[in-house]
Amino acid sequence: MLRASILRASPAVRPLARQTRPQWRVVQRCYADNKNLGETAVPNPAPTVTPSSTEKATIPSSDIPKPPPAPETAGASRSAPTIQPATTPPTGPGSASIAPDPKQPKPKKKGRIRRLLFWLTILSGLGYAGGVWYSLVSDNFHDFFTEYVPYGEDAVAYFEEREFRKRVPWPCWDSPRLQPQNLVRRTSSSILRPQWAEWRVLPTRATATSGTKGPHTIANVQEKKQEAAQTATVVKEEAAAPAPAKPVNHLDHLAVPDANDAVVQDVVKIVNDIITVINADSAHDGKYNSALDKAKSELGRVVSDINLMKANLRKESEEKVKSAHDEFEQAAKELVQRLDHQMQAQEAHWKEEFENERERLSQTYKDRLRSELEAAEKVYEQKTKNELLQQSIHLQKSFTASVRERVEAERDGRLGKLNELSSSVHELEKLTAEWNSVVDANLKTQHLVVAVEAVKSALETQATPKPFVTELAALKEIAADDPVVSAAIASINPAAYQRGIPSPALLIDRFRRVAAEVRKAALLPEDAGVASHIASLAMSKVLFKKSGLAVGQDVEAVLARTEVLLEEGDLDAAAREMNGLQGWAKVLSKDWLGECRRVLEVRQALDVIATEARLNSLLVD
């Protein structure tokens, strides 16, 4: 139906087509899926013409345009009635009707989406058809429709081709040269499409004046029919009387030996095609020879100019590229050298700054240490001087008093109390001897305290258990006559000072490993078997681990409290907590408790020795 309506409307738009045909020749449209404005479609593209194949270029006789048919034939073809197909089948004359079944279910209502899609499809098809029709009428809308609407260019090209075939009924339309699939693209710099120019011009006056019905030709229908009949009679008479044959001067084809450019080759091919067409026309009488000779000479000159320009441009471009390459290499070398110098200078600057900063920090710390040492020495010296000064003042006063008393006594007794003086001297000697014993006792106490601190320091600073037999022997030698110190040393387990005791950090690390094993056996009874061990191991994985000073006597609470006490440094309380375990938990922690016991024994002995030394110093005072 759409094609029929377009065919009926085509006679009305033919005057517009004649007016807009020059515009179509200027605007080079290409019929393809992707439209490129810089390319032009050419039917049956000719191969590239080379100088060797220029002389062989010919046009087959089937491609030479033939004269159009007589006006009567064209008019008859245009005035042929169009048979419209039946759109609806005839209905029968019967009037019988059948009542609907009362039990028939109600038809289901169709969805809105289906109806929407149906009407949307119909409206889209109608809009697309209207766009195609209006594109055949308006040039501006034609450009818009073919460029922005999908497949619009193909649809418009199809109807334009049908209309053109209807106006120009050539027998050569079946040639594969003008098939749409043989259209190729050519750049906009090439010459306007010669093949399309041929079939645009070929419709003659007879076709243009064929029986079209328009508003500007209705009044002169009879006159045009008479003129068409007279023209047909004249054509028949001319065809009946053949003209005498005249000798035909064939033109030579154009041969350009240096035509390496594709555009020049296309121009050569076009000129050769024109020469072939002229040679096929027997009535040219050599009137195109001068124009073609001039065109050949001009084309040769243009080709030589193009080759010369190409050579000059190639030479200039090579020189520019070479100079640019040299400049780039020179700039790159300078840049590399400059970067090397900058990096070396930066590295030297950083080294110098690093050395200066290191020296400054070292000097600063040395000055600070020196100032602190000097301040401490000054304080100590001043304190010592003050004490010595006080003692000297006290001794001077006491000596002055004693001298005064003795002088007075001598004055009073006139050397009568020499016995008292001698007794005083004996008492002074005795007091001096007693003070010597006190000083010796203080030195012994200090040595004992230093030895105890040495043992404690050796035990606290060790990373792994080490024997401390040497320190203990020195302590025993210093306190050889003290029974309390000897008893305290004898109470230490020999394995403790021969193998060493672990530090608090090692005890905590050992406790964490023991705690993991104790948790696995937390749920075991005393007479547990293999199954009980496996069950306890499985249940220990799902038990919640307590933390902090947990309340309770269960294994998890005891382990949590022990860990907190160990972190606080209370080893005695931690050992007491672990000693309160029962069953397999106590058995597994037995070795750890033994180590804790040895550590506590050593600590207790050292505390007793330190207390004894402190007590001796107090008794001496």
Swiss-Prot record:
Q: Which UniProt keywords apply?
A: Coiled coil, Membrane, Mitochondrion, Mitochondrion inner membrane, Transit peptide, Transmembrane, Transmembrane helix
Per the UniProt record, which residue ranges are transmembrane? 117-137
Q: Where is the transit peptide?
A: 1-31
Its main localization is mitochondrion
Q: Which GO terms describe its biological process?
A: cristae formation
Q: Does Metal-binding show up as a keyword for this record?
A: no
The organism sits in which domain of life?
Eukaryota
Mitochondrial matrix compartment residues: 32-116
Q: Where is this region: Disordered?
A: 1-20, 34-109
Q: Which Pfam families match?
A: Mitofilin
Q: How does it sit in the membrane?
A: Single-pass membrane protein
Quote the biased-composition stretches of kind Low complexity, using this chain's numbering: 40-64
List the ranges whose topology is Mitochondrial intermembrane. 138-621
Coiled-coil-forming residues are 311-388
Question: InterPro entries recorded for this chain?
Answer: MIC60
Provide a GO CC annotation, any one.
Answer: MICOS complex
- Please indicate if the UniProt record lists Electron transport as a keyword: no
Q: Where in the cell is it found?
A: Mitochondrion inner membrane
How this chain assembles, per its entry, is: Component of the mitochondrial contact site and cristae organizing system (MICOS) complex.
As for family, the record states:
Belongs to the MICOS complex subunit Mic60 family.
Q: What does this protein do?
A: Component of the MICOS complex, a large protein complex of the mitochondrial inner membrane that plays crucial roles in the maintenance of crista junctions, inner membrane architecture, and formation of contact sites to the outer membrane. Plays a role in keeping cristae membranes connected to the inner boundary membrane. Also promotes protein import via the mitochondrial intermembrane space assembly (MIA) pathway.
Under what name is this protein listed? MICOS complex subunit MIC60
Species of the source? Phaeosphaeria nodorum (strain SN15 / ATCC MYA-4574 / FGSC 10173)
What is the gene name?
MIC60
